[in-house]
Regions:
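A secondary-structure boundary/capping signal
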Residues: 73, 121-122
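Flexible, acidic/Gly-rich N-terminal and inter-domain linker regions that tether
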Residues: 1-63
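Active-site glycine-rich loop that binds ribose-phosphate moieties when present
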Residues: 20, 26, 97-107, 135
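Short, charged beta->alpha transition segments
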Residues: 55-59, 69-72, 103-108
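Canonical Radical SAM [4Fe-4S] cluster-binding loop centered on the CxxxCxxC motif
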Residues: 63-99, 151
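Conserved AdoMet/S-adenosylmethionine-binding subsite of the radical SAM
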Residues: 103-113, 117, 123-271
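Auxiliary Fe-S-binding modules of radical SAM enzymes
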Residues: 1-24, 229-292
């Protein structure tokens, strides 16, 4: 398939893919890959949540929910995940790069006291250097109204060496930072990944995981339970398992809702509450993440 979302993975991710078939499915397209033909899904195209249109409130800032905003900090990742929601936005997304652009985002938030939660996303914010990462964190953490600054990164999985003691120390200073990450199979919880998580957690930074339910990766109860146990043992809180988003080009990963419900039920019968995430779908136009 000719694609505008090329395969890319850093050295660590390529090494992991060489020993984990489940992870490799997230790194490489199969030779037979092609866009799905499901009209109900394909109608959403490459930007199902309107991030280039109605959700964009000022340059690089997206707001879909009243109490939180998302800042586009980067258009690069350590790996181009094949199930990426923003796969169609490569090279098109508005990314905050300049001081004036960041100031405009801060002013937007300051003018809306109901906003209490800022998501620093992309791309992956940790593709930036420490100084740039902290420029974003500090700008929003300094606002009294902001209670949570979420650093949204898959680096713990795709390039865990990026999480250094120095970075963890800097992120911990405000007391407002949470790290949101993504692990989709137990193979991804390597010694390096666990060490990266520990550096953050030992500094008092909560680490939470938003997994994606992916056909051929984690779409069975035993595989999902194994993942959730691995996350809990690494002190990473599994709090969401998402259905694939309604974006073109990822049809091969979709899992039927009934199968997802069965996996959720069996996980609930096998694990304690701390290890149980909510299984949800992110539906364009909905006011919340929708339980399946």
């Amino acid at each position: 398939m000719k694609t505008d979302f090329p395969e890319y993975a850093c050295d660590y991710s390529r090494r992991l893919a060489s020993v984990s078939a489940a992870f490799a499915k997230q790194v490489y397209d199969p030779k037979s890959s092609r866009r799905g033909a499901d009209d109900e899904i394909e109608k959403y195209g490459v930007d199902p949540f309107g991030e280039l249109t109605h959700a964009s409130k000022c340059f690089g800032l997206k707001q879909r929910f009243k109490d939180r905003v998302l800042i586009m900090t980067s258009d690069r990742c350590f790996m181009n995940c094949r199930h990426c929601t923003r796969r169609g936005l490569l090279g098109k997304a508005q990314v905050v790069r300049t001081r004036s652009q960041l100031d405009a985002c801060v002013d937007y938030v300051r003018a809306r006291p109901e906003v209490r939660d800022v998501l620093l996303s992309g791309g992956d914010i940790l593709t930036l250097g420490d100084k740039e990462v902290m420029r974003f964190v500090d700008a929003f953490a300094a606002l009294e109204q902001i209670e949570i600054v979420r650093v949204c990164t898959r680096a713990l999985c795709t390039n865990p060496g990026r999480v250094t003691d120095r970075l963890a120390k800097a992120l911990s200073k405000s007391g407002k930072v949470w790290v949101n990450t993504q692990f989709n199979c137990a193979d991804e919880l390597t010694a390096e990944a666990r060490e990266a998580a520990a550096k953050l957690i030992n500094r008092g930074i909560p680490v939470s995981c938003q997994s994606v339910l992916l056909k051929g990766v984690n779409d069975s109860a035993p595989k999902m339970i194994k993942l959730l146990k691995a996350l809990s043992s690494a002190r990473i809180r599994p709090y969401y398992v998402f259905m694939c988003d309604p974006v073109a080009g990822i049809g091969r990963f979709r899992v039927p809702v009934e199968k997802a419900r069965e996996i959720e039920r069996r996980a609930a019968e096998s694990l304690g509450g701390l290890s149980l995430p909510r299984f949800v779908a992110d539906i364009p136009g909905a006011r919340r993440k929708t339980p399946i």
